[in-house]
């Protein structure tokens, strides 16, 4: 009866998750710089570059022109972006630290972005659009569709094909060591349904943190390439098919996964054999899985797979996360049409302390695909410090994560 009630509430648009997103405190590091004032650079670090499509005080009218003006060295730079809708593709290849700030009063007011019940119209003041999809393989690789790509060069960012993807040369350098974005939405709205890979962002051979950002597409929304490390905090990620996929390491904290429909799975990862014990995979912690709106909610009840293995070394884990009724009772699924479903002894598709009307522990355990972990089994993956590594496999590797985030002690130990 409780599950029926939750389904009816969602259909009426009245459902509300009880996950921690409602109590998120956004990153505070740049709140004075991001705040809307008559002097846009008031409170900003010295040397901050200002981008605006209309303000004559701005040095650049496009974001990419500001990025391209920076030297490819180890110096740190900050770019402040005025409110507006920007239609452009962004490409970051430099190694030095770079921060993109969306003008917003949210951080100053302490308002969460991932709490999707907070606003009637949920969006940041800075929107970046690039509508493109690799439908019928019209591009040589999925990376060409991305709104934002972070990586040292083209080869490093390619997805490729086959069980190991594109063979990135061993001598490829590492890209940006500390890339950060605050209060910006990345939207690839090529079609209102999954119509081929359509990246909102891609991160390869780089460390990237995203705070109070939105990522909107339908298929393959977020791509984390080889040796890519990405940390999402207080974000919204929207998609339908395999919308978290890749080879690297992605940790999503206190965020909302917005289910626009169901197809394939939410996660799809290709693990890699290394000489060290790696932690490549996708980890979703203290977050919520919700139908995107009241129209789709009753249509996708019990239909959304938590993920499917892109190869047999797939690793994904949902921790302390709320499931609405959209989630498939069995949890994960094998990859239909692939030998052995890409599922084997080294495949990790797991949950730990998840809850909500979409969580069915009996069905998940009976599936023989979804693993319900004990505390000891989950312990190696619970915090960012547990999973992020250098390319050589050394830990800790979290200096690039914003230190203003207030975590329970179990999440981030510096």
For every predicted segment, state its role:
Residues 20-53, 58-414:
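Sequence-level preference for short, compositionally simple segments enriched
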């Amino acid at each position: 009866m409780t599950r029926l009630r939750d389904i009816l509430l969602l259909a009426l648009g009245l459902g509300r998750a009880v996950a921690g997103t409602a109590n998120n405190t956004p990153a505070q590091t740049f709140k004075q710089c991001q705040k809307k004032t008559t002097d846009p650079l008031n409170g900003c670090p010295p040397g901050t570059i200002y981008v605006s499509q209309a303000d004559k005080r701005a040095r650049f009218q496009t974001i990419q022109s500001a990025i391209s003006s920076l030297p490819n060295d180890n110096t740190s730079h900050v770019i402040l972006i005025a409110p507006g809708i920007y239609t452009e593709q962004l490409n970051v290849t430099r190694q030095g630290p770079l921060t993109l700030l969306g003008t917003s009063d949210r951080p100053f007011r302490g308002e969460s972005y991932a709490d999707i019940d907070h606003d009637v119209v949920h969006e940041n003041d800075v929107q970046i659009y690039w509508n493109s999809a690799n439908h019928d393989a019209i591009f040589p690789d999925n990376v060409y569709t991305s709104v934002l790509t972070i990586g040292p060069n083209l080869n490093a960012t390619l997805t490729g094909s086959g069980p190991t993807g594109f063979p990135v040369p061993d001598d490829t350098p590492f890209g940006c060591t500390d890339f950060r974005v605050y209060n910006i939405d990345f939207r690839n709205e090529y079609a209102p349904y999954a119509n081929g890979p359509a990246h909102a962002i891609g991160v390869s051979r780089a460390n990237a943190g995203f705070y109070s950002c939105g990522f909107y597409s339908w298929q393959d929304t977020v791509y984390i390439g080889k040796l890519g490390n990405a940390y999402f905090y207080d974000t919204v990620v929207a998609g339908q098919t395999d919308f978290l996929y890749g080879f690297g390491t992605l940790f999503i904290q206190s965020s909302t996964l917005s289910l626009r429909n169901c197809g394939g799975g939410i996660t799809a990862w290709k693990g890699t054999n290394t000489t060290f014990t790696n932690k490549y995979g996708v980890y979703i912690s203290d977050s919520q899985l919700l139908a995107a709106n009241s129209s789709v909610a009753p249509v996708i009840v019990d239909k959304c797979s938590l993920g499917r293995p892109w190869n047999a070394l797939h690793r994904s884990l949902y921790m302390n996360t709320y499931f609405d009724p959209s989630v498939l009772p069995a949890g994960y699924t094998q990859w239909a049409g692939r030998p052995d479903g890409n599922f084997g002894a080294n495949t990790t598709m797991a949950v730990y302390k998840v809850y909500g009307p979409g969580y069915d522990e009996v069905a998940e355990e009976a599936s023989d695909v979804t693993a319900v972990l004990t505390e000891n089994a989950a312990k190696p993956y619970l915090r960012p410090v547990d999973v992020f590594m250098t390319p050589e496999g050394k830990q800790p590797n979290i200096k690039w994560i914003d230190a203003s985030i207030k975590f329970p002690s179990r999440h981030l130990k510096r």
